[in-house]
């Protein structure tokens, strides 16, 4: 009777039994996750959700170590995201107590895993939104680490960090130095370094990877002196610390605007800081709104609460900090139409077959993106980018040019500079770069569409395998390749060698060849390419850079309230001087942050 109650005899169970972690001892106490069986053959994955890596943070203060807990912490469900505005920006969701991480550990049959490479994910979302688990599709979270962990045989960690004003508000001095979200990220990385061995990870083989604001965060973490010895490798997808949106040059301007909205003093930063720290954090979060309608300047200028050069976590302009990353293997790359998401907000006609874009539309976009160099900057940029229009001025060509412009400024050129900087400072470290060009799967987009911003995420996280109904065989091909490159790199520092086979050899980047891997569904020996948009790189780094600056990068340009300002017009024949957006009475902090939904 007893045996029948217990089910099959132990002998039958032996086939299905798998190694699993059970209760794990960490610095805070014991944690227990869930072991999920993956096959009849005994493969499984241990999943821990919601382990605290820091104490509940105090508003606008650095995070502190967690005091620990009694008994065993049941780590079985995702914690809420950090407090942030909803997409409609009229209310908040999430919690102030949000500094938790999640861990996926792949297990074989015989013994629990040990010495596995560790991959820590940093989400994007303009430093304004986002969560460790990402959006939920078909009851599968975007940043679920299972596919990467099991296919690449690596441990995957995701975590929350503070965003928006609570993560990045700064007075630009010691009263509110800012970068709280970056300190949160650092705390998570340091916690993993100290504790991951108990989960079967190799604390000396940690790879950071992230996209958009997360890619820029990865970059900034490798450049900060505080992470010396913590990070072995890093991958930045569509975002580096040199992107114009990744550093706020005039944080006090935006801090004052928040202070005014919530009724705090603005003339004394010490009093302002004291007042802001005791203000309802929900009110602080809602005091900033990203304008979603039509705006005087490109959206780039309104992304305000982002990292700052604080002289501490980021001791200098990031371009000068690459010696700190000399021993970190690095991959950085972009999507071929990363700028499309932003042009779609700045010039909605771009996505409509029925609407044309004019030379004036393009010139206005150029002017808004070249404010620091004034009229000469706008005219020089307009001339370089419209040169191909002499042969072909079709709507498709014009719209693609607009996408190229924002892709270049916001993503590609900064990434190319970052890769060159890394390479020229690297000692033993490897450098690789890529261009992701698998066309967007959004049916509403134009037929000329390439890979939009954030299109790479679904492939890196294995969605074509996790939710196969929504995908085709070719999508699984792309996903398999990306997971193979990413996890091989995490294991060995070389994307070609490790646990998985790859479809094409990815050569290390050299300054001479300016070589990169093009990633899409058709990969073979021709996938390595040379000199991506080199003439545009030269334009931005030499010609444009040499022009006199008319408003400093920190100058705040406030768009006129009544929108009465004359629109800029393109030069007719290089003689007509176009009216320039007035910088004097205007307001947008120069180039800050980006969105990776």
UniProtKB/Swiss-Prot annotation:
GO CC annotation terms, alphabetical: cytoplasm; extracellular region; membrane
EC code: 3.1.1.13, 3.1.1.3, 3.1.1.6
Cross-referenced InterPro entries: AB_hydrolase_fold (IPR029058), CarbesteraseB (IPR002018), Carboxylesterase_B_AS (IPR019826), Carboxylesterase_B_CS (IPR019819), Neuroligin/BSAL (IPR051093)
Signal peptide as annotated in the record: 1-18
Disulfide bonds, paired cysteine numbers: 82-98, 264-275
Hydrolase as UniProt keyword: yes
UniProt keywords, alphabetically: Disulfide bond, Glycoprotein, Hydrolase, Lipid degradation, Lipid metabolism, Secreted, Serine esterase, Signal
Class of this enzyme: hydrolase
Subcellular location, record wording: Secreted
Means of activity regulation: Activated by bile salts such as sodium taurocholate.
Molecular function as annotated in GO: acetylesterase activity; retinyl-palmitate esterase activity; sterol ester esterase activity; triacylglycerol lipase activity
Regions annotated as coiled coil: none
Region entry Disordered, spans: 553-591
Active site: 212, 338, 453
Pfam families assigned to the protein according to its UniProt record, in alphabetical order: COesterase
Catalytic activity: a triacylglycerol + H2O = a diacylglycerol + a fatty acid + H(+); 1,2,3-tri-(9Z-octadecenoyl)-glycerol + H2O = di-(9Z)-octadecenoylglycerol + (9Z)-octadecenoate + H(+); 1,2,3-trioctanoylglycerol + H2O = dioctanoylglycerol + octanoate + H(+); a sterol ester + H2O = a sterol + a fatty acid + H(+)
Xref: Gene3D superfamilies: alpha/beta hydrolase
Glycan attachment residues as annotated in the record: 205, 379
Keyword Glycoprotein set for record: yes
BP-aspect Gene Ontology terms: ceramide catabolic process; pancreatic juice secretion
Primary role: Catalyzes the hydrolysis of a wide range of substrates including cholesteryl esters, phospholipids, lysophospholipids, di- and tri-acylglycerols, and fatty acid esters of hydroxy fatty acids (FAHFA). Preferentially hydrolyzes FAHFAs with the ester bond further away from the carboxylate. Unsaturated FAHFAs are hydrolyzed more quickly than saturated FAHFAs. Has an essential role in the complete digestion of dietary lipids and their intestinal absorption, along with the absorption of fat-soluble vitamins.
Assembly and interaction partners: Interacts with CLC.
Alphabetized PANTHER family for the sequence: NEUROLIGIN
UniProt record similarity statement: Belongs to the type-B carboxylesterase/lipase family.
Protein name: Bile salt-activated lipase
Gene name per UniProt: CEL
